[in-house]
Curated annotation (Swiss-Prot):
Known function: Probable transcriptional regulator involved in developmental processes. May act as a transcriptional repressor (Potential).
Species name: Danio rerio (Zebrafish)
Segments of this protein annotated with the region Disordered: 70-126, 170-228, 310-341, 405-425, 516-573, 656-681, 693-748
GO MF term (any one): DNA binding
Biased composition (Polar residues): 76-88
Positions of the DNA-binding region: 963-1033
Database matches in PROSITE patterns: ZINC_FINGER_C2H2_1, ZINC_FINGER_C2H2_2
Lineage, uppermost ranks: Eukaryota, Metazoa, Chordata, Craniata, Vertebrata
Family per similarity comment: Belongs to the teashirt C2H2-type zinc-finger protein family.
Protein's gene: tshz1
Bias-annotated ranges (Low complexity): 186-205, 213-228, 656-671
Protein name: Teashirt homolog 1
Keywords of this entry: Developmental protein, DNA-binding, Homeobox, Metal-binding, Nucleus, Repeat, Repressor, Transcription, Transcription regulation, Zinc, Zinc-finger
Major subcellular location class: nucleus
Record-linked InterPro entries: HD, Teashirt_fam, Znf_C2H2_type
Length: 1158
């Protein structure tokens, strides 16, 4: 019996592999526990009878078998399952046929084995148990071999389909399938039973029954009991999901256990497959893959979560650069490292904090998440890359050679070395390795980026215009806002070719002089350094300052490095919390002292220009600030403040608040004499000019009173700004250590004028005694410069465009010569400049001599704006809108009579034409002589069409042609005609609204004939008006058209009308004719033109000397009166020159008879 069972089961396993064999064994034991013994015996008899007689299946049986197999393929098609394809036991996947690896098999076999044990205890003997166990063990081995040896690949799927038919025929010969089907269909005959155990028969019969019923719905019942058992088994079993098994087997590298009712994508993880076998079918379309396990995720978040959970990410901070390519090889995806631009990719995919490069965005993201470096990335972006693009070519050399003031490399590492020793030894190329061709962005390999950023921070956060460095991006932003340098950089980039070529020393100075930081505090070093030098005579200070200037000239490349004196370094180290440049706190604090810089500048510019340009303010807001600064700063030397900051490193290096520590009242420091009085004098001179132009010439007495008032106000206010003193009027030694706190002016200082020649002599005789004195004089320069921007009250801001104009003039004049004649009045010189600007861009020494004391910052301050210190700087008349700051120590008596007498000598024609001369002068200066670009004039021209004072033919333009807007070049009469015609085309709807209708072709032709405008131009104008009305509901001459209450505006007199008819009548009053007469007028106008053009052509053809053999007629263009010998030529002319369409050619062509040669 054991051999019979073994033979039967060996034959049966083929069918089990084809069909759902993983359900076969568990269910056969389930059935063995419940099928009656009689039924089992009958099944066994049928089986043996079929085997002995070799009966073949009848037609019905064969048909049923085929149907059964076909149905099995249709339902589940187990043969197509890649379950056993390349089943690699080593992959860790337990076959569903093994009794231990599959959860479903284990689950189903549990109950069957329990039932089987009960039956065996009751019915079976020990021999039967042993035989059954042996047979089961043998069958397990057979199935294991079958599964491991079979090739269920995609190539053999079709073969396995046909194998089903062949297997059925083979089995029919051996009667295995016969027995199975006969039992299932109750065709077995009663044959004597062999002595097999009931349990074995039960096993055999139930196995066949389960197999048949699981694969076919046509299975018939053996008996009622057996049928119930089969149905129960079917309802309790779970159908095998071949697709899941295939995915799980082919995609998985780790052990996987099939769940009872798995969902396809909930349990299948999309791991990287063997693409050679299956291609991209199961690869998934995800973009983000784990490098370690190749798991794909739709989102970067999913990948990040996976990496964090599994630990598959790598700490790239610890990897070496050379090992990365080897470890992270990806067969299916070419990484950025393997492509041509891997270096560029590494530059882009780089951690901004530690400097590591990554080959993919996922790697960088994981690195950032793991290391939290995204929280530490500095928000300061490297600027020199932009600088190299935007900075003009003349500036690039200086920009690269000069180090930033705060750069770590620019500060001497040995604090004991004074400035004079350290500055010359610094090699600019070595000190600024940041700006190199191969290191554009300043990123270095490795994790040293943070250190390098700190080391190069001063160069990164550097103003591209003036070169000043800043500690934070906010400081740089504030600096750019206040000084307007960002506007200059932008404009200079577009106008690179307009730089003026100066001599090298001047050019270097221009490029290296930045505007000072606008702060309300004086540098303490100026005051602290005073006690160090026991003797401070005023002339000695002058000499030291002048000597300091010369001392710094050979070191222009070090100007921006701002080497600190040891004493300054100590103070800087003591006050690390203080910053060198304007901070947000400074902007907040500045209004306390009445120094709201932005507001004061805005008020200044708008007020001053409103007076200069016929009382209409045209600049406002930030443009006014930038315009004012650019008028002064387009040549940086024009502002006395410019150089002091960079030449004077101690001012920047020391804390801004240090001044307040020494002088609690924040008053003018006596150690900072000089430039502002010059600037104040400029302001006074320009004020005087404006008053002369307007016919108001206050008396000398009035001016003195105003000056005295201003002095007292300014001093009593105790503004936190430097002392505005003239260099020539230095305080005496007694005054150097005590700030003046009252509104009186020291008479000794007032009456101590020093000439430029004396300066030079003393400059030659007196060297700088020590670094402290030099620094003190530098600080004095810086303080005086600060006054230009900051030392003013909110009511009277200091910087005005007129003084800026004067600064520009004097700057260029200062470049012309270095001799000075201080007795010439700057006002008279201003008129000479304006009158002679067109003929003489450069001036003779007599004119230029007066500028020498002004221009102090180039060669001995030769480029200081116009110096009025030789004249009394306090006597000029003042405007309410221009601010002048009078220092307590800056007044000299030498120029009071000069200004007063010259004010009376100015002739009335000069007064009348002064503004026009100034505008011409500014245009020429800014367009031809400005080293940066013509930004001052361009700003003034572009800011408003009303600023036509900068245009050449201003006096020829009518007021309408000066108006704003894109149509400012239109003939006002043409515009009135167009507007009237458009208004006439409006149609009123019953609800009171107006509908825009197009002008008819006849109306357009009339306009075209009368105005000479092309049809295209008229169409464009109409289309533009319609677009504006649709988009905004209004245009320049028509408002609120959508509301039903339109407002018509006359562009000629600004009158307002509510209805189109009244508006048209008004426009017709301006035109002098009605629109109905337009067609008649156009014809009459053409006739008049013909009469006029005949006379013109007579002269023209006499000049042309036409040959007699020419054609009998010539053709004239009515629009421009040019003549042509052929109709074709004139039509070509009309099309190309005037844009006329061919259909209108005849309208604009006049045929003239040939003129006889004169």
């Amino acid at each position: 019996m054991i051999s019979l069972i073994l033979q039967f089961m060996l034959k049966l396993h083929i069918l089990g592999t084809i069909l759902s064999h993983h359900l076969f064994f568990p269910l056969c034991f389930v059935f063995s526990a419940y099928v009656p013994e009689d039924e089992l015996k009958a099944a066994k008899i049928d089986e043996e009878h079929l085997q002995d007689d070799g009966l073949s299946l009848d037609g019905q049986d064969a048909e049923y078998l085929c149907n059964e197999e076909d149905d099995g393929r249709e339902q589940l098609s187990y043969q197509n399952s890649p379950l056993s394809n390349g089943t690699n036991p080593d992959a860790g996947y337990g076959s569903p046929l093994s009794d231990t690896s599959d959860h479903l098999a284990d689950f189903k076999s549990t109950s069957s084995k329990e039932g089987q044990d009960k039956e065996e205890v009751e019915d079976m003997d020990t021999d039967a148990k042993l035989s059954l166990q042996d047979s089961l063990a043998q069958m397990k081995a057979v199935y294991a071999n079958l599964i491991s040896d079979a090739s269920w690949s995609s190539i053999t799927k079709d073969i396995m389909k046909s194998k089903q038919v062949s297997a059925s025929s083979i089995n029919s010969t051996s009667s295995s399938h016969k027995g199975n089907n006969s039992v299932a269909n109750s065709h077995a005959s009663t044959i004597a039973s062999s002595g097999a155990s009931s349990s074995s028969n039960a096993s055999a019969s139930t196995k066949t029954n389960v197999t048949q019923s699981s694969n076919s719905t046509k299975a018939t019942t053996l008996t009622n009991a057996n049928n119930g058992t089969i149905n129960g088994a079917n309802s309790g079993g779970v159908a095998y999901d071949w697709h899941q098994a295939a995915l799980a087997k082919t995609l998985q590298h780790t052990p996987y256990h099939l769940m009872p009712e798995p969902s396809l994508f909930s349990t299948v993880q999309l791991y990287r497959q063997n693409n050679k076998l299956y291609g991209p079918v199961f690869t998934g379309a995800s973009k983000f893959r784990c490098k370690d396990c190749s798991a794909a995720y739709d989102t970067l978040v999913g990948l990040t979560v996976h990496m964090n959970e599994t630990g598959h990410y790598r700490d790239d901070n610890k990897d070496k650069e050379e090992d990365r390519g080897k470890k992270w090889s990806k067969p299916r995806k070419r990484s950025l490292m393997e492509m041509e631009g891997k270096e560029d990719a590494q530059k882009v995919l780089k951690c901004m904090y530690c400097g590591h490069s990554f080959e993919s965005l996922q790697d960088l993201s994981v690195h950032m998440i793991k290391t939290k470096h995204y929280q530490k990335v500095p928000l300061k972006e490297p600027m020199p890359a932009l600088a190299s693009k935007l900075v003009p070519s003349t500036k690039k050399r200086v920009f690269q050679d000069l180090m930033s003031p705060c750069s770590p490399d620019s500060i001497s590492s040995t604090p004991g070395i004074p400035l004079a020793e350290t500055a010359p030894t610094k090699d600019p190329k070595i000190s600024n390795p940041y700006v190199t061709a191969n290191n554009r962005y300043g990123y270095q390999n490795g994790a040293s980026y943070t250190w390098q950023f700190e080391a190069r921070k001063a160069q990164i956060l550097k103003c591209m215009e003036c070169g000043s460095s800043h500690d934070t991006l906010q400081q740089l932003t504030a600096h750019m806002m206040v000084t307007g340098h960002f506007l200059k950089v932008t404009n200079s980039a577009s106008k690179k070719g307009k730089q003026l070529v100066f001599d090298p020393v001047v050019e270097e100075k221009i490029q290296s002089i930045p505007l000072p930081p606008t702060t309300t505090r004086l540098p303490a070093p100026a005051i602290k350094s005073q006690p160090d030098s026991p003797i401070h005579p005023s002339i000695m200070d002058d000499r030291k300052e002048l000597e300091e200037e010369k001392f710094e000239e050979p070191e222009e490349k070090k100007i921006k490095q701002e080497k600190e004196d040891p004493s300054e370094r100590v103070e800087k180290s003591e006050k690390l919390s203080h910053y060198k440049y304007l901070r947000e706190e400074d902007l907040e604090e500045s209004p306390k002292g009445g120094l709201d810089i932005l507001k004061s500048l805005e008020n200044t510019v708008s007020s001053a220009i409103s007076k200069a340009q016929t009382g209409t303010p045209t600049w406002g807001g930030y443009p006014s600030i930038h315009a004012a600064y650019q008028l002064q700063g387009s040549v940086k030397s024009s502002i006395p403040a410019i150089q002091s900051v960079q030449i004077q490193p101690t001012f920047n290096a020391s804390s801004l608040k240090s001044l307040t520590s020494d002088s609690s009242t924040l008053i003018h420091s006596p150690s900072s004499p000089s430039p502002p009085p010059n600037h104040k004098s400029n302001v006074l001179a320009m004020e005087e000019l404006v008053e002369k132009v307007t016919g108001k010439i206050p008396s000398k007495k009035d001016r003195d009173e105003k000056l005295t008032e201003r002095n007292s106000k300014h001093l009593t206010a105790e503004l936190p700004s430097p002392v505005l003193k003239e260099r020539k009027d230095l305080p005496k030694p007694d005054d150097l250590t005590k700030p003046t706190k009252n509104g009186t002016v020291d008479k000794d200082l007032e009456h101590t004028p020093v000439r430029e020649g004396e300066y030079k002599e003393s400059h030659a005789d007196n060297p700088i005694k020590n670094g402290t004195d030099a620094l003190k004089t530098q600080v004095s320069n810086g303080c005086g410069n600060l006054g230009i921007i900051t030392d003013h009250s909110p009511e009277q801001p200091l910087v005005n465009p007129l003084s800026a104009l004067q600064s520009i003039m004097n700057t260029h004049l200062g470049k012309a010569s270095k001799t000075v004649s201080p007795l010439l009045d700057p006002l008279a010189m201003l008129y000479k400049i304006s009158n002679n600007m067109m003929e003489k861009p450069m001036y003779n020494p007599a004119q230029v001599k007066q500028v020498e004391p002004i221009n102090r910052y180039y060669e001995n301050d030769d480029d200081q704006p116009m110096d009025l210190t030789k004249s009394k700087s306090g006597i000029g008349p003042t405007n309410n809108c221009t601010s002048t700051i009078i220092s307590n120590s800056s007044i000299t008596n030498s120029t009071r009579p000069i200004l007063s007498t010259l004010a009376e000598q100015v002739s009335s024609p000069l007064r009348e034409n002064a503004l026009m001369d100034i505008s011409d002068m500014v245009k020429n200066l800014t367009g031809r002589l400005t080293p940066k670009s013509s930004t001052p004039s361009s700003i003034s021209e572009k800011s408003d069409a009303d600023g036509c004072a900068f245009e050449d033919g201003l006096e020829d333009l009518s007021p309408i042609q000066k108006r704003k807007g894109r149509q400012s070049n239109w003939n006002p009469q043409h515009l009135l005609i167009l507007q009237a015609q458009f208004a006439s085309s409006l149609r009123e709807t019953p609800d009171g609204k107006y509908i825009i209708t197009d002008l008819g072709p006849q109306e357009r032709v009339h306009i075209c004939k009368f105005t000479g405008l092309s049809m295209t131009t008229i169409s464009h104008w109409l289309a533009n008006v319609k677009y504006q009305l649709r988009r905004t509901g209004g245009t320049k001459f028509l408002k609120n058209i959508d509301s039903g209450h339109p407002l018509f505006l006359c562009s000629d007199c600004a009158s307002q009308f509510r209805t189109p008819s009244t508006y048209i009548n008004h426009l017709e009053s301006h035109l002098g004719f009605s629109l109905k007469d337009l067609s008649k007028l156009s014809i009459d106008l053409i006739r008049d033109q013909q009469a006029v053009t005949k006379m013109i052509t007579d002269k023209t053809f006499r000049a042309l000397d036409l040959n007699e053999e020419d054609s009998n007629s010539i053709f004239q263009c009515k629009l421009c009166n040019r003549t042509f010998v052929s109709k074709h030529a004139v039509k070509l002319h009309l099309s190309k020159t005037h844009g006329k369409s061919p259909e209108d050619h005849l309208i604009f062509v006049t045929e003239l008879e040939k003129l006889e040669k004169a």
